Amino acid sequence: MINYLKSFFLYEIVRGMALTLRYFFKAKVTINYPYEKSPVSPRFKGEHALRRYENGVERCIACKLCEAICPAQAIVIEAEALDDGSRRTTRYDIDMTKCIYCGLCQEACPVDAIVEGPNFEFASLTHTALIYDKERLLQNGDKWEQALTSKLYKDYEYR
């Protein structure tokens, strides 16, 4: 008899609507993405960047540790020796479509030249735009230098 009354008064539907109405008047937890952004963790791994020293010289010493450790083989480096005996890169390419953003290149770098920055909005319509050359990586480093420095400082105790 009770089951008959429950089905007659559409008990399940009333319970479902009550639950819906209860959540309808609660505060919203979503954000309006393009206009509001959630905070990013200091350990977030985003778009790659090559850093420079304070005097403007690029940090990369062409040791190729990042190329060797990259599990996706997304990094290609070519280097040449300078007159003073040091080496500098002539080509430093990262294929962002191959990259798995593991951060091993950043961990392997002895001079903190290659880092993964806070930027996560670098979508593109073409594959060639996602193959970053040395100039693009250095531009990213110049653009995000303050954020990268503070990120590395906050992450220092975990390295």
Swiss-Prot record:
Keywords: 4Fe-4S, Cell inner membrane, Cell membrane, Iron, Iron-sulfur, Membrane, Metal-binding, NAD, Quinone, Repeat, Translocase, Ubiquinone. Residues 51-80, 90-119 form the 4Fe-4S ferredoxin-type domain. It catalyses: a quinone + NADH + 5 H(+)(in) = a quinol + NAD(+) + 4 H(+)(out). [4Fe-4S] cluster 2 binds at C70, C99, C102, C105. PROSITE patterns: 4FE4S_FER_1, 4FE4S_FER_2. One of its GO terms (cellular component) is plasma membrane. Its cofactor is [4Fe-4S] cluster. It holds the Pfam family Fer4_7. It is an enzyme of class 7 (translocase). One of its GO terms (biological process) is aerobic respiration. It is a peripheral membrane protein. GO terms for molecular function: 4 iron, 4 sulfur cluster binding; iron ion binding; NADH:ubiquinone reductase (non-electrogenic) activity; quinone binding. Its EC number is 7.1.1.-. PANTHER family: NADH DEHYDROGENASE [UBIQUINONE] IRON-SULFUR PROTEIN 8, MITOCHONDRIAL (PTHR10849:SF20), NADH DEHYDROGENASE UBIQUINONE IRON-SULFUR PROTEIN 8, MITOCHONDRIAL (PTHR10849). NDH-1 is composed of 14 different subunits. Subunits NuoA, H, J, K, L, M, N constitute the membrane sector of the complex. NDH-1 shuttles electrons from NADH, via FMN and iron-sulfur (Fe-S) centers, to quinones in the respiratory chain. The immediate electron acceptor for the enzyme in this species is believed to be ubiquinone. Couples the redox reaction to proton translocation (for every two electrons transferred, four hydrogen ions are translocated across the cytoplasmic membrane), and thus conserves the redox energy in a proton gradient. This is NADH-quinone oxidoreductase subunit I. It comes from Rickettsia canadensis (strain McKiel). The lineage of its organism: Bacteria, Pseudomonadati, Pseudomonadota, Alphaproteobacteria, Rickettsiales.
